[in-house]
């Protein structure tokens, strides 16, 4: 029986530099998105929400999860991708960690997956800076989101015409 070959130092260095990350994939209108699990505090199912008047299109509304009021974003709308008209109850809300009290709306959530940093490809030009990259998993393309940048993009301030006296 032949003995296994020794791996070179460069192979060992490459293996050490390739870190593993857990992602929580979710879907909206036949598009797959994901966030790193260390950005997610919890998931909630079947949550009614209240729409906010004059809110940007990517803001679905507010929802109460575990006694906290969260602003819920539609990632697809924030990225100017096809989305859906949300009914009065959100199928899933991904509760994000942090003081911003944000959540992401989802039609469905999938099981957590583990990927290597080497598997992450640069995002497409259309996703701007709200996407960290794209990963292909089980034959599907998943867009990895940067939750903080997604919020900034969703609520971009646009100059409105002001009344002058």
Regions inferred by a protein language model and the residue ranges of each:
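An acidic, low-aromatic, low-complexity terminal/linker signal
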Residues: 1-165
């Amino acid at each position: 029986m032949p003995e296994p070959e020794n791996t070179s130092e460069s192979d060992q260095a490459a293996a050490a530099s390739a870190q593993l990350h857990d992602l929580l994939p979710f879907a909206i209108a036949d598009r797959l998105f994901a966030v790193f699990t260390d950005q997610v505090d919890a998931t909630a199912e079947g949550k009614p929400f209240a729409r906010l008047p004059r809110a940007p299109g990517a803001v679905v509304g507010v929802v109460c999860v575990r006694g906290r009021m969260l602003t819920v974003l539609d990632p697809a709308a924030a990225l100017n991708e096809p989305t859906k008209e949300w009914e009065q109850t959100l199928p899933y809300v991904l509760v994000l960690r942090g003081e911003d009290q944000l959540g992401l709306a989802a039609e469905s959530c999938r099981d957590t997956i583990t990927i290597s940093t080497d598997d992450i490809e640069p995002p497409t030009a259309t996703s701007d800076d709200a996407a960290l990259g794209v990963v292909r998993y089980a034959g599907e393309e998943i867009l990895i989101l940067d939750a903080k940048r997604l919020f900034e993009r969703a609520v971009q301030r646009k100059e409105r015409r002001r009344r002058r006296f």
